[in-house]
A protein has these predicted regions:
Chain A
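Noncatalytic luminal/extracellular "stalk/propeptide" segments of secretory-pathway proteins
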Residues: 31, 35, 47-145, 150-152
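His/Asp/Glu-rich mid-to-C-terminal helical/loop segments that flank catalytic regions of hydrolases
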Residues: 285, 410-450
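N-terminal capping segment at the start of a domain
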Residues: 20-60, 186-194, 262, 334, ...
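Extracellular/luminal Protease-associated
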Residues: 60, 109-200, 268, 378
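Alpha-helical metal-binding/catalytic segments enriched in His/Glu/Asp
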Residues: 75, 241, 257-315, 437
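N-terminal signal peptide
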Residues: 10-22
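Metal-dependent peptidase/peptidase-like ectodomains
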Residues: 107, 265, 308-412
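Soluble metallo-hydrolase cores and metallopeptidase-like ectodomains found primarily
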Residues: 25, 105-109, 114-138, 191-270, ...
Length: 450, 450
């Protein structure tokens, strides 16, 4: 149990700080998680959440029950300031028994998932298959169902296909079938948020988007019928979950680590974003436990964790929280999220997607160097996709989103599919993510200034 | 186009034979496929079969239509002896809207596929989760639904779980839920053949078998309801497809390469076994084309290709053919099948699963050496699973089943799932399989004796 020996040595010696990162502090925290008493605790914490409540769709009982269950556990853990804050007017969309059927050249019920937010609609029309987005500008799509059969180039590059409703509707299209956003499939379409336009729209499995592509290349006329029963319902109120480790010197300066609790209505939302929640919880639990053993470990600034609601619906929960707090007396010093797979980083292709200025970036580099010294390979990369913490990032608060190497590709095997289950995580995945989030939170809560 | 140069050189020079394998002959054939005019032709041949007819379930119109389409194409190709032979009394099973629902500890419609051959049944009972088959002998399963949540160790090792109905019924079990037979899943259960017993039985997705396993380990009582609507119907008659390249010296001695045309009622049966068919067709086409260019390339024995029906139902089509022909005047000299993924071999973990005596095995080794010299890594391995050609293998006819390295594991990502689509094949997969099957057929059709 080398972490115990290390802790004893640490308690007997002053922290040795080079730059603003104290490597002993990072070592204590990461060893406590990866090889010490906290090992596997995040995964164990996650199990009853996803197994007992299942997926947690916004405006559904399973989400609100899961929120209650989580708050109760956080109170038992003894965190500071455990509470929920209401997020009113949340989008309420319910999936129905939707069908999309290829009628010609042969009858085949297609393997689809309706895109979130679409209202009931029926349409039968000829389909045109486009292998690239820009072809909408040179192809007659008027009166047609547009089928996108793009090559996977990455989620953020390809999301325009799923969100094309408004643009293709303006060109006269009567329906949208977008190839699912992922690099690999076993008959597994992906859902996700779409446009507000009431154009019938669904994601096709990779296999069947490619089938339609091949049929079109052989000059077959494709006739497709779309029958959407899904619908929007009156808005609901949901809740964000907040819990703190109160800062000893600057309690009103907040270092934020976060993940989201809501999910789509498929699988059990373990990957997206139960694993993120578990890593955030584990990081918080470890900082609290180490602080109880050694008061010097307690943070100077407040470390706050938030489990957002309504992430899957345009970050609606986080945006509401931001609006409520942006003019408050608390100052957000740093914000972060983990929502692209709480995976173990195995190469320095694992990144902290960072927004901030040059000085701040240099500090991130120091943190990353310290993580590397503790066998956590990772690098800093500029990027502007910060998910739920985007509002603060846009405000100039330094921000990070953790993306493991597996988060760039493997994550999208399962994202928004029926395959989003706890077994995606391998031993250590959540531990490593917790070690990264905990290190960020702890180091930044204690530095003098940005 | 080095194959043309090679062909010219070959035509001008006598075959150089070391042992019984003529390496020039193998090189001509493999180059013609892998880098010559036949490149990609198998994959192109397969496309309309799977895209225009879809899956091809026994006793369904799509199978018989696909048989007619295939026969017509073979006739146009000019093969000898193109015909079908009826296989009567074939099992006729139709999947219904089957549901399996977890009632306690929470309500969840489980992600299942009924096991083939099961008749309508309804049962609600407590479930017991077993992580290993042998636990049926030490666990009280009387009145219970048995859920198997085994670790994947391989298809042939684990198939006992799917076929456990008879045995667990004898112990008083009232239902069977078997974890799907595969190493990896994206919410993708696998179907397959089961037992004849009328015990309600279905395959669970990996994810949900593991979910039930975790709930049981946390001492939750599991209550499950099974409602099977699938049913057996009166038997039907289907057809095997036979086509030859007639032997020039020993036409009544048959060298057989084969694959099966029927599939389960999911996906499009491209992997299982459209790819096998395409490779067999491509091998036959190439041998015929090379023989037209150079008469010396024509086989001395008859090379026969068969596309079996009813493979998915206990090899019923092949067994019928065997019974009809075992006492005929034709002598089966060698039999083979490709039905475990028509993939490119990338390592010598790719095998010819071989049954035969020591002398025959030595000859297989020579063929394999020649394939290796032509950049096709493969090895010979003893094994007794020869699929549709098992009857001949059991009779002592030397036999081979081709299993690429990807056939051991990756194949079972898709096997009997909704993900069995043409896109599984990468560039070259079917070409390489055709090169192997073609080499086996051609070399063995021309050797003096075993």
């Amino acid at each position: 149990m080398d972490w115990i020996l290390h802790l004893i040595l640490l308690l007997g010696s002053p922290y040795l700080t080079v730059g603003f990162v104290n490597n002993d502090e990072v070592q204590t925290l990461t060893r406590y998680i990866l090889r010490g008493p906290s090992r596997n605790s995040g995964l164990e914490w996650l199990e009853p959440l996803v197994d007992d409540f299942g997926h947690r769709m916004l405006c559904r009982k399973s989400l609100e029950d899961a929120i209650d269950f989580t708050v109760e556990r956080l109170r038992q853990d003894g965190f500071d300031n455990v509470h929920t804050e209401e997020a009113p007017n949340m989008p309420n969309w319910e999936r129905g028994e939707d069908t999309v059927t290829l009628l010609e050249p042969r009858n085949l019920k297609l393997n689809i998932l309706t895109i979130g937010g679409v209202d009931p609609a029926k349409v039968t029309a000829e389909a045109v298959v486009l292998e690239d987005y820009d072809l909408i500008n040179t192809t007659n799509v008027n009166g047609k169902i547009v089928v996108f059969n793009q090559k996977w180039t990455g989620y953020y590059e390809d999301i325009k296909y799923r969100r094309a409703a408004k643009e293709i509707k303006a060109l006269g299209a009567v329906g949208l079938l977008a190839k699912s956003l992922g690099p690999f499939s076993i008959g597994s379409p992906h859902t996700g948020g779409g446009s507000d336009e009431h154009l019938p729209a669904a994601s096709l499995s990779l296999e069947e988007a490619e089938l339609l592509g091949r049929l079109a290349r052989r000059n077959k006329t494709l006739k497709i019928s779309i029958d959407i029963r899904s619908k929007n319902l009156p808005p609901c109120t949901s809740r964000n979950i907040i819990f703190d480790i109160k800062g000893s010197e600057k309690p009103e300066e907040v270092v934020l680590i976060s993940a989201h609790i809501d999910s789509w209505d498929l699988g059990q939302g373990a990957l997206d974003d139960g694993g993120g929640m578990a890593a955030v919880w584990q990081a918080m639990k470890v900082i609290r436990e180490l602080g109880q053993t050694d008061k010097r470990f307690l943070p100077k600034r407040t470390i706050r964790a938030i489990f957002w609601t309504a992430e899957e619906h345009g970050f609606a929960g986080a945006k509401h929280y931001y609006e409520q707090h942006k003019n408050g007396k608390e100052k957000f010093y740093f914000v972060s999220e983990t929502d692209q797979g709480a995976f173990k980083p195995t190469t320095t292709k694992s990144i902290l997607r960072f927004m901030g200025n040059t000085t701040q970036r240099a500090k991130m580099q120091e943190i990353v160097q310290s993580l590397k010294r503790n066998d956590i390979p990772i690098s800093v990369q500029e990027g502007d996709k910060q998910g739920d913490v985007q509002s603060w990032a846009d405000d100039g608060v330094p921000s990070v989103q953790y993306v493991a190497d597996k988060g760039a590709d493997f994550y999208f095997y399962f994202h928004h599919t029926t395959g989003d289950y706890l077994n995606i995580f391998e031993d250590g995945d959540i531990d490593y993510t917790a070690a990264i989030m905990g290190t960020l939170a702890h180091v930044l809560s204690n530095q003098d200034k940005w």
